[in-house]
Amino acid sequence: MSALVVGASLGCDSRETATASESPPPRTAGELSAYAGSESCAECHREAYDEWKRSHHANAQRDLDPALDDEVFSPRREIAHGSQTSFADTKDGRYVLTTAGRDGKMRDFVPAEALGVFPLWQYIIPGERGASQLTELAWDPVAKEWFNVYGNEDRQPGEWGHWTGRGMNWNSMCAPCHTTAFRKNYDPVADRYDSKYVEKGVGCESCHGPLKAHVEWQRKHPDGGFFGDPTLKKLTPDQYLAVCASCHSRRGDLTGRFAVGDEYFDHYDPAMPDLSQTFYPDGQILDEDFEFNVFQLSYMHDAGVRCNTCHQPHTSKIRKPVNDLCLDCHQSSMGGRIAIDPATHGCRPHGPDAAQCTDCHYPQTPYMQRHWRHDHGMTIPDPQLTKEFGIPNACNRCHQDKSVDWAIESAEKMYGERMDRPTRRRARVLARLKQHDFTAVGEALELLAAEKNGAWRSVFLRMLTPAVYEPRDPDLRQAVRQVMIDRLGDPSPLVQSAAIDALEPLGPAVSDHIRPLLHAPYRLARVKAAWALRHEIDLQSPVGRELSDLLVYSLDQPTGAFRWANFLNETGKPGQALSWYKKAVEWDPHSAPFRHGYAVALSRLGRLDEALAQMLEGVRLAPQDGLFAHSLGLVYGEMGRLPEAREALARAVALVPDQSRWWYNLGLAENQLGNFDAAVAALEKAEELEPSVADYPYALATIYLEQNRREQARAALGRVLQIDPNHAEARRLAEQP
C-alpha cells in the first residue's frame, strides 16, 4: 500500500481502451467567457494597470520581442553545457535554438514565446499533440549570456527531466502560473492537450477573479449606481493569501480548478518539512519552495502578516526600504510584538554596509543557478544548529571566512541566553527524528501537544511516521499510532493529511478511524481519506468524484500513471494496471520505484521473466535501496532460483537490517538451500526484531523438528503459543510425542 502523494510529476497511457473503470475521460475546456482581460481594467484603473504592466507578473510569459530577443540569438552563440554543445542563431528571419532533441540528434527548434523576465528567461518550443516544452537553456539579461538552469547535471534525452521530457512540459509544469485562467485540458486516451487561457502572464483576473460582469456593469453605471457594484465580492486576507499561494508554493494540484476566493487546501497539497531533502529540520528551505510553504511555519503568518503587508500587489515590490518596512511593526512591543532597537540590534547596525533585516531573517539561496530566492520562514540564525546538525545559519552565509565556532561565540555575546530559545529545541528534536533517532520520540510528542501552529504540528507527524512502524519497541509504536489516530481530529487539514498518510499502510485496522474524514471540511483531507479507503470507495459518490478528479488531472505525468496503475492494481484490476505501469516507466525510465511497481504487478500475474528484467533495472538504478533488493529476492524465489534469491535477500538485510520480514524470508531461503545454521540465525534475528510475530518462532520450530532438535522446537512452539494461543499448527506440533 502507498500513501497518496500529490506531486508535480504525474502520468497516463494512450494505448489502452478507455472505460469508466480504467481511463477517466479528459476534462472539457474551461469556461473562459467570464473574463474580460487586463486591458479592460486600464479604462478606470490606469495607475494600477501601469504599475502591473511593468511587473514580472505581467510579463511572466510573453511574445517574442526583437528589442529583447535579437541580442539573444544574434550573433550566433555557442552554448557549452555538460557534455553537450548547443547553438542560438537566427535563420531565415527566425530565432533558432540548435540542441539535442528527444531522439538525441541535434535539431533546429524555433521558439514561440519566452517565459520569465529577471534574472533569467527561457523559451517555449511547440511540440506534438498540443504539448509545448520549456528549454533548459536560459538567457541571463544582465550577464548577457546563455546558461543551463540545471548547471552540470547534463540531463540526457530520454530522461524525465530533459527539456524534451515530461518534466519540462509547459502545459503541466509552467503554464498554470505563467498565464491567466489556464485550463490544461489533457486527453489521456489520445495523449493530447487542448490547453486554453485568457492571456499570457499573470493578469489582473488571476488575482481579482473574472471581471467581465464587473466591466459591463461599470460601463452601464459610470456613476457607481445607487447600491454600488453588485458584481464585486470582498475577499478576506486569507483568501488573498490563497491566491498568492496558489502559485507561490511547492505543491501538488488536486483539481486544476483553483478560483479566486477558494480555499487553498481545497485545491493543493503543499510540500512541508519531512524526511525528504526539501527542507532543513528547522524549516529553512533546502530545495525550492516558492515562498508559501515555510511562510506557514513563521511567527509572522500566525500574527496575521500577509503578502500584501509587505508587497505592493501591482508591482510585487516591497512597499518601502526593508528595515523601514519591518520597523512598521517592530518599533514597539504593543500587541505582543518583539520591539527592535535598530541602533543596537544585529551585528552591523550602522554605516553604509549596515545589515538589512532580510540578511539574517530572510536568507537567500540560488535556484536555477542564478535565481536568488528569499526564505520566507523568517527564521532566527542559530550557528549551534549548524555545528550539531549541519543546518545553515545566516551568520556564516555572510561571514564565509569565519568558522561556525566563531559564529556561535559571536551570537552568544550579542544575545546570551536568548539563543537557547524554543525554536532550537524543536529543531534539535526534528533533526534527531529525521536521523531515525527514536529516543527523540517522547520529547517530540511533548512538543507536538504544545504546538499551536498547525503547519508545525503536521511537520511533527511527518517526522514521527517511521515510529508508527518501529518493530523493536511495540510500546513506542503503539503510542505513536494512537497519537496519529487522535490527530485525525485536528482542525488543521495539513495535520489531518499527515496523519492519514502515516496510518494508511495499516489498512483495515485504521479504516474506521479514517472514514469520518471523507466528510472533512477541506478537500485535501477528503481525498487523502478516499485514497486510504480506495478499496471500498464509490467513485460516483461526492468524495469518490473528488478522488477521480485528482487521478484524472495528473494523468499527463509519470507519477499520475503510476498512481492510477496502483489504484487499478489494488482494486482488483491488475491486468488493466500493467499498461499504466509501463507508461510510467516509459515516461521516466530512471525511476526505480516505477520499475519496482511494474515488476511486482508482472510477478503477481505470473510474468516472472518480465518482472525480473524490471526488478534488475530497478536495483541497478537504486543499488542502496533495500526494498528493491528484497523484492528481487522474492522474484528469484518464485522462479526457483534460490542461490540468487538468497544473495538478493542477504543484500537487502545488509542495507536495511531492521526489517524483520526480510530476515524471515532470508531464513526460509537459507533453509531451502540446506544452510541450517544460517537459516536459524536469520530467523532468530527476525524474532529479535519483532518478537510479537508468531510466524518467526513457528518457522524456527519447523526447522528444528526437521533437524530432530525437539527441545529447541518445543521452546520455539511455546513462544508461538504465547503470542497466539489459538495457533492451530503450533498446537498440533506441540502435542506430538
What do these predicted ranges mean?
Residues 438-448, 470-488, 507-518, 539-549, ...:
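Amphipathic alpha-helical scaffolding segments comprising HEAT/armadillo-like alpha-solenoid repeats
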Residues 493-496, 523, 558-559, 592-593, ...:
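Helix-start (N-cap) detector for alpha-helical repeat units in TPR-like alpha-solenoids
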Residues 505, 535, 570, 604-605, ...:
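Register position in tetratricopeptide repeats
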